[in-house]
Amino acid sequence: MKTASLAANHSLLWFAVAGLLAARRGSSRKAALRGVFAIAAASSTANAVLKPLLPRRRPAASELPAYQTLDDPPTSSSFPSGHAASAAAFATAVAMESPRLGLAVAPLAATVAYSRVHVGVHWASDVVSGAALGAGLALLSRRWWPVRLTDEARARPLDTVPVLRDGEGLVMVSNQRSGDPEHDPADDLEAAFPKAVVVRARPDRDLDEQLDEAVEVAGSSVRAVGAAGGDGTVAAAAAVAGRRHLPFVVVPTGTLNHFARDVGVYDLQEAVDATAAGEAVAVDLALVEVHPGATSDAVIRTRCFLNTASLGSYPDLVRLREAWQPRWGKWPAFAAALVVVLRRAEPVAVRIEGRWTKVWFLFVGNGPYHPRGMVPAWRPTLDSGLLDVRWLRADIRFSRLRAVAALLFGALGHSRVYGQREVAEFDVELSVPGMLATDGEVVEESGRYTFRVAPQPIEVYRRREENWTGRDRPFLP
């Protein structure tokens, strides 16, 4: 007990455990990051705030055997126990991200908490109160750092898609430039779908044009189209599926694979299972109409996107967040990226709902994102028929400072600098033509954009897990 108590001094024990957890990507690393932030909140609250405000005499350790007591006992207030607060905060935070890891850490946290009574430096009520404080602060972190234990969103199951055994009737495009440049996913596709037509994307031509040509050549035998690549590749191929009213197959081989994770297709095997069984879900396809400028041809161009579109500095914000996310986690990375981007960003004058205003950025999600009033993180549903539009105003004094402060306190949705709408169609006009980014790629420049949801969702193959209970599910970190 004495050893456990000393090891937890200054939270060194928990930092060591966090280091071990952070060595693995995925939920383990996220658990470590949340645990460290929870310790910071619990320790500072207990030691810097509550102890000075609530002084309490420590127990008389002289009544205990010398081998049981500490050589250098603390002299600060006994209430509450900072060790118990940090232990409970760390264990609770870890359990929020990974219940399995939380179960492993909990006995160690309980040992540290009890050890403070055992060595005679705290009353039992100090430890109980400290543990409650730590657990409460860890749970409170969900207000600005939400927990998502599953990747895939809800979507309406469909029984109308054809069965594609061995990929018969499937035309797929494979983008080797997505993900690992040393690996060509086309070889894997040809092995998994021996009867499919696999097109290796050429970098000097538009990907959707290459897929369209392959579909034309295959003729009436085509029953579905698909793509292997990242979000940009998948979005381009999904546009072909939408135009031709064909079911869609997605195989995640990119770096982040946001759409595949939302749909719930984690690897090639899941796509093979779904196509062989004819299992699919309905997914909204978002459209953006790019209006012509005064000096261009009077033709409205329409682009498709599956995840998000953005104007202003939002693409830079996402780029920084994704670069830092593997080391820090999504929410700390987003907060840091927001500070950096807002510091050097230039406001954009836009007309929203008939009124001109200045914004730092404008975000459009294909479907409502959660959490509301905060940083958009995930979609609970894929077929809502709505767009999630958010913007950060720049026409209010100290808007950047207020936005960062509101984000840190989990109150962005209540701030005057923040705007949000959930609509089926949204029109925005810019005073000066600005660049549009869709699904992480800058694609157009115009002075006016109209966003809407396509009248019909696309059919995306996704296996029904209740029919595949014998399959292990992979996890994309």
Range-by-range predicted roles:
Residues Q325-P332, V375-S399:
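Gly/Ser/Thr-rich active-site loops/lids in small-molecule metabolic enzymes
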Residues M1-A42, A124-G167:
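Terminal transmembrane helix and immediately flanking juxtamembrane interfaces
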Residues R177, H183, G242-P247, T253-W360:
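Catalytic core of DAGKc-family lipid kinases
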Residues G354-W356, T381, W391-P477:
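ATP/nucleoside-binding phosphotransfer catalytic cores, i.e., glycine-rich phosphate-binding loops
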Residues Q68-V161:
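Membrane-embedded catalytic cores of phosphoryl/pyrophosphoryl-handling enzymes
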Residues H83, D126, D231, P252, ...:
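Short, conserved phosphate/pyrophosphate- and ester-handling motifs at nucleotide-, phospho-/glycolipid
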Residues M1-S76, A85-V112:
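Hydrophobic alpha-helical bundle signature of multipass membrane enzymes
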Residues T150-V225, A235, A239, P477:
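ATP/NTP phosphate-donor binding region
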